[in-house]
Amino acid sequence: MKLLIIIASILVLVFLLGWIGLQIRPRPFSPYPEQTGEIKTIPLAAGLPAPVERFYKTVYGEEIPVIDSAVMKGHAFIAPFGVKLPARFLFVHEAGKGYRHYFEATWFGMTIMKVNERYVDGKSLFEPPVGDPIIDDASTNQAANLAVWAEAAWFPSIWITDPRVRWEPVDDNTALLFVPFEDKMENFVMRFNPETGLLDSMEAMRYRDAGPQAKKILWITRNVEGKKIEGSKLNAIGSATWMDQGLPWATFTLEEVHYNVNVSEYIRQKGP
Protein backbone atom coordinates (compact mmCIF):
# COMPACT_ATOMS: atom_id res chain seq x y z
CA MET A 1 0.00 0.00 0.00
CA LYS A 2 2.81 2.37 0.90
CA LEU A 3 4.50 1.64 -2.43
CA LEU A 4 1.29 2.48 -4.32
CA ILE A 5 1.03 5.81 -2.48
CA ILE A 6 4.63 6.63 -3.39
CA ILE A 7 4.07 5.74 -7.05
CA ALA A 8 0.84 7.77 -7.16
CA SER A 9 2.57 10.75 -5.56
CA ILE A 10 5.39 10.59 -8.10
CA LEU A 11 2.92 10.45 -10.98
CA VAL A 12 1.02 13.44 -9.60
CA LEU A 13 4.26 15.41 -9.23
CA VAL A 14 5.34 14.53 -12.77
CA PHE A 15 1.96 15.59 -14.15
CA LEU A 16 2.04 18.82 -12.12
CA LEU A 17 5.57 19.57 -13.26
CA GLY A 18 4.59 19.00 -16.88
CA TRP A 19 1.53 21.22 -16.53
CA ILE A 20 3.53 24.04 -14.91
CA GLY A 21 6.07 23.89 -17.74
CA LEU A 22 3.30 24.42 -20.28
CA GLN A 23 2.07 27.57 -18.51
CA ILE A 24 5.35 29.47 -18.94
CA ARG A 25 5.49 31.73 -21.98
CA PRO A 26 8.69 31.74 -24.01
CA ARG A 27 10.71 34.90 -24.30
CA PRO A 28 9.91 36.88 -27.45
CA PHE A 29 12.18 36.75 -30.46
CA SER A 30 14.65 39.60 -30.81
CA PRO A 31 13.01 42.72 -32.26
CA TYR A 32 13.18 43.09 -36.02
CA PRO A 33 15.90 45.69 -36.76
CA GLU A 34 14.12 47.51 -39.59
CA GLN A 35 11.29 49.93 -38.89
CA THR A 36 8.09 50.31 -40.89
CA GLY A 37 8.74 51.89 -44.25
CA GLU A 38 6.82 54.59 -46.09
CA ILE A 39 3.14 53.78 -46.40
CA LYS A 40 1.24 55.39 -49.25
CA THR A 41 -2.54 55.51 -49.38
CA ILE A 42 -5.28 55.33 -51.98
CA PRO A 43 -8.91 56.44 -51.70
CA LEU A 44 -11.44 53.85 -50.59
CA ALA A 45 -12.98 52.42 -53.73
CA ALA A 46 -16.69 52.77 -54.43
CA GLY A 47 -19.00 49.85 -55.07
CA LEU A 48 -17.89 47.52 -52.28
CA PRO A 49 -20.50 45.33 -50.55
CA ALA A 50 -22.06 47.19 -47.61
CA PRO A 51 -20.38 45.23 -44.76
CA VAL A 52 -17.02 45.46 -46.54
CA GLU A 53 -17.27 49.22 -46.98
CA ARG A 54 -18.31 49.59 -43.33
CA PHE A 55 -15.32 47.47 -42.26
CA TYR A 56 -12.78 49.55 -44.15
CA LYS A 57 -14.25 52.84 -43.02
CA THR A 58 -14.14 51.59 -39.42
CA VAL A 59 -10.52 50.43 -39.66
CA TYR A 60 -8.97 53.01 -42.00
CA GLY A 61 -11.43 55.75 -42.86
CA GLU A 62 -11.47 57.01 -46.45
CA GLU A 63 -7.74 56.51 -47.13
CA ILE A 64 -6.50 52.93 -47.50
CA PRO A 65 -2.83 52.12 -46.82
CA VAL A 66 -0.91 50.19 -49.46
CA ILE A 67 0.93 47.36 -47.70
CA ASP A 68 3.53 45.45 -49.71
CA SER A 69 5.15 43.40 -46.95
CA ALA A 70 4.94 42.63 -43.25
CA VAL A 71 7.13 41.11 -40.54
CA MET A 72 5.08 39.93 -37.58
CA LYS A 73 6.15 38.36 -34.29
CA GLY A 74 4.33 37.24 -31.18
CA HIS A 75 3.26 34.46 -28.85
CA ALA A 76 0.94 31.56 -29.53
CA PHE A 77 -0.59 28.40 -28.22
CA ILE A 78 -0.48 25.55 -30.71
CA ALA A 79 -1.85 22.02 -30.44
CA PRO A 80 -0.34 19.98 -33.29
CA PHE A 81 -0.77 16.71 -31.39
CA GLY A 82 -3.79 17.59 -29.28
CA VAL A 83 -1.68 19.04 -26.44
CA LYS A 84 -1.70 22.83 -26.09
CA LEU A 85 1.89 24.07 -26.21
CA PRO A 86 3.13 27.62 -25.59
CA ALA A 87 5.03 28.95 -28.57
CA ARG A 88 6.53 31.99 -30.21
CA PHE A 89 6.16 32.75 -33.90
CA LEU A 90 7.55 34.75 -36.78
CA PHE A 91 5.50 35.47 -39.91
CA VAL A 92 7.11 37.16 -42.92
CA HIS A 93 4.77 38.18 -45.73
CA GLU A 94 5.16 39.48 -49.23
CA ALA A 95 1.60 40.73 -49.29
CA GLY A 96 -0.67 38.71 -51.55
CA LYS A 97 2.19 36.58 -52.89
CA GLY A 98 3.91 34.47 -50.26
CA TYR A 99 5.11 34.02 -46.71
CA ARG A 100 7.34 32.13 -44.37
CA HIS A 101 6.54 30.89 -40.88
CA TYR A 102 8.82 29.91 -38.04
CA PHE A 103 7.45 28.43 -34.82
CA GLU A 104 9.14 27.36 -31.61
CA ALA A 105 7.06 25.41 -29.10
CA THR A 106 8.44 25.47 -25.57
CA TRP A 107 8.31 23.83 -22.15
CA PHE A 108 9.53 25.86 -19.17
CA GLY A 109 10.55 28.41 -21.80
CA MET A 110 12.92 25.93 -23.46
CA THR A 111 12.46 25.07 -27.12
CA ILE A 112 11.18 21.52 -27.61
CA MET A 113 9.93 21.77 -31.20
CA LYS A 114 10.78 23.88 -34.26
CA VAL A 115 8.82 24.24 -37.48
CA ASN A 116 9.87 26.01 -40.66
CA GLU A 117 7.47 26.50 -43.54
CA ARG A 118 7.15 28.85 -46.45
CA TYR A 119 5.24 29.56 -49.64
CA VAL A 120 7.36 31.46 -52.14
CA ASP A 121 7.05 31.68 -55.93
CA GLY A 122 3.94 29.51 -55.77
CA LYS A 123 5.76 26.58 -54.14
CA SER A 124 5.35 25.41 -50.56
CA LEU A 125 7.91 23.97 -48.18
CA PHE A 126 6.93 22.39 -44.87
CA GLU A 127 9.55 21.02 -42.50
CA PRO A 128 7.75 19.14 -39.71
CA PRO A 129 9.47 18.49 -36.37
CA VAL A 130 9.54 14.78 -37.26
CA GLY A 131 9.80 13.26 -40.72
CA ASP A 132 10.84 14.38 -44.18
CA PRO A 133 10.07 17.85 -45.56
CA ILE A 134 7.09 18.29 -47.85
CA ILE A 135 8.09 20.24 -50.96
CA ASP A 136 5.82 21.75 -53.62
CA ASP A 137 2.92 19.41 -52.85
CA ALA A 138 -0.28 20.37 -54.69
CA SER A 139 -2.50 20.12 -51.61
CA THR A 140 -0.02 21.98 -49.42
CA ASN A 141 0.30 24.71 -52.06
CA GLN A 142 -3.46 25.29 -51.93
CA ALA A 143 -3.44 25.41 -48.14
CA ALA A 144 -0.49 27.78 -48.09
CA ASN A 145 -2.05 30.16 -50.60
CA LEU A 146 -5.15 30.46 -48.43
CA ALA A 147 -2.90 31.26 -45.47
CA VAL A 148 -1.37 34.10 -47.50
CA TRP A 149 -4.77 35.77 -47.62
CA ALA A 150 -6.13 34.75 -44.22
CA GLU A 151 -3.13 36.11 -42.33
CA ALA A 152 -3.69 39.41 -44.12
CA ALA A 153 -6.35 40.00 -41.46
CA TRP A 154 -3.47 41.84 -39.75
CA PHE A 155 -3.05 44.09 -42.82
CA PRO A 156 -6.45 43.81 -44.57
CA SER A 157 -5.95 46.68 -46.99
CA ILE A 158 -4.40 44.12 -49.38
CA TRP A 159 -7.90 42.73 -49.95
CA ILE A 160 -8.82 45.88 -51.86
CA THR A 161 -5.46 47.23 -53.06
CA ASP A 162 -4.58 44.03 -54.95
CA PRO A 163 -6.40 44.23 -58.32
CA ARG A 164 -6.65 40.43 -58.55
CA VAL A 165 -8.99 40.28 -55.55
CA ARG A 166 -12.72 40.81 -55.79
CA TRP A 167 -15.68 40.94 -53.40
CA GLU A 168 -19.26 39.77 -53.80
CA PRO A 169 -22.16 40.63 -51.48
CA VAL A 170 -24.11 38.04 -49.49
CA ASP A 171 -26.10 39.91 -46.84
CA ASP A 172 -25.80 42.81 -44.39
CA ASN A 173 -23.00 41.17 -42.41
CA THR A 174 -21.46 38.69 -44.86
CA ALA A 175 -19.50 38.87 -48.11
CA LEU A 176 -17.44 36.58 -50.31
CA LEU A 177 -13.75 37.33 -50.83
CA PHE A 178 -12.25 35.85 -54.01
CA VAL A 179 -8.47 35.44 -54.13
CA PRO A 180 -6.16 34.10 -56.86
CA PHE A 181 -4.56 30.66 -56.75
CA GLU A 182 -2.55 29.50 -59.74
CA ASP A 183 -4.91 29.78 -62.74
CA LYS A 184 -8.16 30.00 -60.78
CA MET A 185 -9.90 31.82 -57.94
CA GLU A 186 -10.81 30.54 -54.49
CA ASN A 187 -13.06 32.17 -51.97
CA PHE A 188 -13.55 32.91 -48.30
CA VAL A 189 -16.84 33.53 -46.54
CA MET A 190 -16.19 36.74 -44.60
CA ARG A 191 -18.41 37.38 -41.58
CA PHE A 192 -18.52 40.85 -40.04
CA ASN A 193 -19.68 41.90 -36.60
CA PRO A 194 -23.01 43.76 -36.89
CA GLU A 195 -22.21 45.95 -33.87
CA THR A 196 -18.55 46.89 -34.38
CA GLY A 197 -18.32 46.50 -38.16
CA LEU A 198 -15.05 44.59 -37.71
CA LEU A 199 -14.26 41.22 -39.23
CA ASP A 200 -15.33 38.31 -37.03
CA SER A 201 -14.25 35.28 -39.07
CA MET A 202 -13.09 33.85 -42.38
CA GLU A 203 -14.10 30.43 -43.72
CA ALA A 204 -12.64 28.43 -46.60
CA MET A 205 -12.32 24.85 -47.79
CA ARG A 206 -8.65 23.99 -47.28
CA TYR A 207 -6.40 20.96 -47.40
CA ARG A 208 -4.93 19.94 -44.04
CA ASP A 209 -2.86 17.01 -45.30
CA ALA A 210 -0.44 16.54 -48.16
CA GLY A 211 -0.70 14.07 -51.00
CA PRO A 212 -3.22 13.16 -53.70
CA GLN A 213 -5.60 11.52 -51.22
CA ALA A 214 -5.99 14.68 -49.13
CA LYS A 215 -9.48 16.10 -48.72
CA LYS A 216 -10.56 19.67 -48.13
CA ILE A 217 -11.93 20.53 -44.69
CA LEU A 218 -13.73 23.67 -43.59
CA TRP A 219 -11.08 25.95 -42.07
CA ILE A 220 -12.14 28.86 -39.88
CA THR A 221 -10.00 31.74 -38.70
CA ARG A 222 -11.43 34.07 -36.07
CA ASN A 223 -10.50 37.48 -34.77
CA VAL A 224 -10.60 37.49 -30.98
CA GLU A 225 -11.80 40.62 -29.19
CA GLY A 226 -9.40 42.13 -26.68
CA LYS A 227 -5.91 43.35 -27.43
CA LYS A 228 -5.56 45.60 -30.50
CA ILE A 229 -2.63 46.13 -32.83
CA GLU A 230 -0.93 49.26 -31.55
CA GLY A 231 -2.29 52.37 -33.21
CA SER A 232 -5.15 50.57 -34.96
CA LYS A 233 -8.59 49.08 -34.43
CA LEU A 234 -7.53 45.65 -35.69
CA ASN A 235 -7.58 42.76 -33.26
CA ALA A 236 -4.13 41.46 -32.35
CA ILE A 237 -5.40 37.99 -31.41
CA GLY A 238 -6.57 35.39 -33.90
CA SER A 239 -7.32 31.69 -33.91
CA ALA A 240 -7.47 28.90 -36.49
CA THR A 241 -9.83 25.92 -36.31
CA TRP A 242 -10.52 22.84 -38.42
CA MET A 243 -14.24 22.19 -38.45
CA ASP A 244 -13.88 18.47 -37.73
CA GLN A 245 -11.82 19.22 -34.61
CA GLY A 246 -14.15 21.84 -33.20
CA LEU A 247 -11.56 23.70 -31.11
CA PRO A 248 -8.76 26.01 -32.27
CA TRP A 249 -5.50 24.22 -33.03
CA ALA A 250 -3.70 27.56 -32.74
CA THR A 251 -4.23 30.96 -31.16
CA PHE A 252 -1.84 33.77 -32.08
CA THR A 253 -1.19 37.06 -30.26
CA LEU A 254 0.60 39.63 -32.40
CA GLU A 255 3.09 41.71 -30.41
CA GLU A 256 5.37 43.26 -33.02
CA VAL A 257 4.69 44.23 -36.62
CA HIS A 258 6.60 46.17 -39.27
CA TYR A 259 5.05 46.99 -42.64
CA ASN A 260 6.66 47.78 -45.99
CA VAL A 261 10.12 46.48 -45.15
CA ASN A 262 12.46 44.65 -47.53
CA VAL A 263 11.71 40.93 -47.15
CA SER A 264 13.13 39.71 -50.48
CA GLU A 265 15.86 37.67 -48.73
CA TYR A 266 14.33 37.30 -45.27
CA ILE A 267 11.30 35.46 -46.65
CA ARG A 268 13.57 32.73 -48.06
CA GLN A 269 15.51 32.12 -44.86
CA LYS A 270 14.81 29.73 -41.98
CA GLY A 271 14.66 30.23 -38.24
CA PRO A 272 14.17 33.52 -36.41
Regions from the PLM with identified roles:
Residues 54-132:
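N-terminal mature ectodomain segment of secretory-pathway/periplasmic proteins
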Residues 5-23:
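Hydrophobic membrane-insertion alpha-helices, especially the h-region
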Residues 25-71:
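N-terminal leader/targeting segments and the immediate start of mature chains
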Residues 89-95, 117, 163-170, 190-191, ...:
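Short, exposed beta-strand/loop patches in secreted or surface proteins that constitute
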Residues 126-182, 213, 270:
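Flexible, processing/modification-adjacent segments and terminal tails
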Residues 66-73, 95-102, 170-178, 200-201, ...:
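Short, hydrophobic/aromatic-rich segments at coil-to-beta transitions
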Residues 105-111, 127-134, 204-209, 239-246:
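Short, solvent-exposed aromatic-acidic interface loops
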Residues 176-264:
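Gly/Pro-enriched, hydrophobic low-complexity segments
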